[in-house]
């Protein structure tokens, strides 16, 4: 066990208490007065249910007084009864770390789900509750992480060593986009990746496992899952388990790490459930009163230190498409780039359904990405914004009533909107179209040509779901051939 893990180890390790009350996943345990376990300590008990013996793990959440502690169970509490003995492990939950975790799936407790535990050759075990790196060790980064997706690279460039949020309501393509990022970035990145499945569908976890195996990136990836059917305590802690594995690669092995989290909203939701179970007074919209603090404890650990980085991509569900909801609103402050997915764009069949006007990036600045890239991005946004302002007039009077200048703006905006769509590798099984990777140089050249009017003669359809300008020309040639 590392020094970090032993920081929390109480002198009362091995102390035994007895269950006093069970209310769903919340368990009150009575310990001897001189052996009260510390907050965050892991407790264990063994029970027999239907002839099968299983170990249940709890995490200490509150000291109630009168020698009672309140703990949250990380497994189903079926079969637990009052009077059952509970043992204090003397430390928080620990998970295996090191090269031995690559290529395997783990649960929140660090137990492998794909192989026997004896097959995991861990370098060490680290506690999941750790301090964020000291301020003096942090290192800012402005290096662009190229994804090969036009709309992202042009308008919301990602930062190597930064935190990236993929925001969107239900069914607009968050999980597909994060899977696409795993396929693209992890494959080109060549480093270590860690994936945290927080409160999402088990089917998606299985799909991800298969896709990563096919893409050849599984051998360099550790996956940690706490899915929808798990108790709230598990869903609240699984992101910390995955992050701890990523921190080991960053701090001990001095590697650059990719951390994918799907979904941060489920982390917040689990915190809300746990908060209610612990009897705390809810805050705005029913969320936990310590929402900002809880989010900060996670996000402040996802950072880059001198010489090595954690680049994080986080899917964030937006309930009812309401960006003022406290859960997504609290996350915004921690991110370096935000990619907002639009239901209106998705309804037009344009994927990835990134909203070019609301998505942002800290490095969308000429000193970081160059003048040509910046100027093209600004021109694209100006054309799209002008087109948006003209939509009310078009809806009432029609396009014919616009001035010639405005007609040109609308025409180019429609081509830009189509050209922002792109065929992806993940969606090939649905579309039958091979994915494409477009270099940032080709992306800037393509959109510059549209803004300059060099492609005004090309039909809009030729820009739909293609890669670079070469694909546009091929599509245009096909369309001309078909109309002869």
UniProtKB/Swiss-Prot annotation:
Catalyzed chemical reaction(s): ATP + H2O + 4 H(+)(in) = ADP + phosphate + 5 H(+)(out)
InterPro entries in UniProt: AAA+_ATPase, ATP-synt_VA_C, ATP_synth_F1_bsu, ATPase_a/bsu_AS, ATPase_alpha/beta_chains, ATPase_F1/V1/A1_a/bsu_N, ATPase_F1/V1/A1_a/bsu_N_sf, ATPase_F1/V1/A1_a/bsu_nucl-bd
Compartments reported by the entry: Cell membrane
Segments forming a coiled coil: none
Membrane topology category: Peripheral membrane protein
Residues bound to ATP: 168-175
Keyword Zinc: no
Known function: Produces ATP from ADP in the presence of a proton gradient across the membrane. The catalytic sites are hosted primarily by the beta subunits.
Record-stated family: Belongs to the ATPase alpha/beta chains family.
HAMAP family xref list: ATP_synth_beta_bact
Protein name: ATP synthase subunit beta
Organism: Arthrobacter sp. (strain FB24)
């Amino acid at each position: 066990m590392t020094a970090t893990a032993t920081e929390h180890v109480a002198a009362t390790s091995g102390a035994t208490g007895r269950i006093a009350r069970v209310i769903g996943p919340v368990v009150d345990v009575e310990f001897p007065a001189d052996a009260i376990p510390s907050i965050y300590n892991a407790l264990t008990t063994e029970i027999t249910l239907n002839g099968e013996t299983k170990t249940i793990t709890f995490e200490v959440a509150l000291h109630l007084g009168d020698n009672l502690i309140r703990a949250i169970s990380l497994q189903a509490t079926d079969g637990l009864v009052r009077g059952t003995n509970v043992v204090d492990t003397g430390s928080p939950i620990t998970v295996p770390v090191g090269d031995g975790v690559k290529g395997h799936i783990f649960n929140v407790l660090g137990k492998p789900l794909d192989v026997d535990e004896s097959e995991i050759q861990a370098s060490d075990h680290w506690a999941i509750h750790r301090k964020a790196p000291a301020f003096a060790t942090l290192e800012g980064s402005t290096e662009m992480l190229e994804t090969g997706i036009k709309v992202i690279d042009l308008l919301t460039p990602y930062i190597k060593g930064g935190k990236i949020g993929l925001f969107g309501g239900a069914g607009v393509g968050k999980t597909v986009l994060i899977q696409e990022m795993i396929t693209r970035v992890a494959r080109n990145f060549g480093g270590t990746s860690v994936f945290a499945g927080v409160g999402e569908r088990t089917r998606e976890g299985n799909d991800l496992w298969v896709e990563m195996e096919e893409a050849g990136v599984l051998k360099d990836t550790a996956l940690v899952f706490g899915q929808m059917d798990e108790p709230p305590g598990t869903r609240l802690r699984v992101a910390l388990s995955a992050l701890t594995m990523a921190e080991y690669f960053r701090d001990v092995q001095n590697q650059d790490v990719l951390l994918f989290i799907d979904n941060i909203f489920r982390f917040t939701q689990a915190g809300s459930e746990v908060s209610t179970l612990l009897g705390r007074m809810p805050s705005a919209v029913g969320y936990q009163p310590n929402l900002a603090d809880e989010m900060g404890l996670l996000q402040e650990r996802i950072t880059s230190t001198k010489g090595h980085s954690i680049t994080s991509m986080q899917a964030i569900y937006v309930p009812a498409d309401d960006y003022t909801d406290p859960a997504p609103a609290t996350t915004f402050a921690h991110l370096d780039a935000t990619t907002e997915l639009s239901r209106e764009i998705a309804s037009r069949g344009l994927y990835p359904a990134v909203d070019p006007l609301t998505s942002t990036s800290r490095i969308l600045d000429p000193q970081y990405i160059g003048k040509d890239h910046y100027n093209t991005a600004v021109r694209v946004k100006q054309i799209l914004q002008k087109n948006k302002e003209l939509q009310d007039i078009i809806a009432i009077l029609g396009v014919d009533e616009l001035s010639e200048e405005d007609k040109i703006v609308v025409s180019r905006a429609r081509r830009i909107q189509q050209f922002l769509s792109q065929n992806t590798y993940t969606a090939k099984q649905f579309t039958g179209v091979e994915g494409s990777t477009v270099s940032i140089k080709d992306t800037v050249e393509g959109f510059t040509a549209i803004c300059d009017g060099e492609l005004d003669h090309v039909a809009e359809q030729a820009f739909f779901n293609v890669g670079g300008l070469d694909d546009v020309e091929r599509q245009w040639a096909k369309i001309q051939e078909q109309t002869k």
